[in-house]
C-alpha cells in the first residue's frame, strides 16, 4: 500500500510515491452506511449510492481532508455511537446548522490526479506478471485467474489481460452461493466482457448447497475455516481438472491478495 493524503478539492485521495508497510487502508463511505450510523441527523446529503461521500480510516471519518466524525463501541447487538467533530465555536463541522451540504467524491478528477503514479505502478505490475508467466509457462498445464467479483480480483484480471495473450489463461469464479447481489451483477458483467474479448470464463460450484454445508459443519469461523475449501478451492480444482482433462494437472493461480494485507487475510 502506498502512503496517501486526503484531497480537499476532489474529496478523494492522492497517492504518494513512497510505499508504506503500515496502511490505514482508507475505505470509501456511501450514503447507505451513513444512514445506518445516523449521519443524516447531523449532516445534509443526497441519498444516493452511486458515488461515495467520504473516507473512513478504521472508525474515523474524513470529508474533504477534514475529520468530521468517529464511531465508538458497537457490536452484533448494539449500534455504535456516532460522535461528530465540532469546531471551536461548538458547531458540527460541515453540519446542517452551517448550511453545508455534503457532496460526493469527484472520482474522475481524483483519477486524473493519480494517473501518473498509477501508470508507473500498473506498468511495473504487468512486467512482473509477464516475467512469472514466461518463467513457468512450459512447466504448467493451466494458468488461471481466481475471480471473486471483488475489487482486488477485478483489478488483477485487468492487469493479467494487459500482460498475457488471450488464450494463455482462464478465469474461474468460485460461486459459494453466499455472495451479495452486487457481486453476482459484477460477475455477470465481467463474464460478458470476457466473452466479448475471447477470454475463457468459467464458474465453479460445490455440489453442496450452502444450507446443507452449514448443517454439516456449522457456521464458518476463524478456527474452523471450512467454507473456502468446500465452496471455493475444491470446486475450482475440479473445474481445472475438467478444463485440462487431467486429474494431476500442474497449474498457477493469479490471486488478488495484496502483499501488505494482514497475515490473517493471506
How should each PLM-predicted stretch be described?
Residues 2-266:
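ATP-dependent adenylation/nucleotidyltransferase module used to activate substrates
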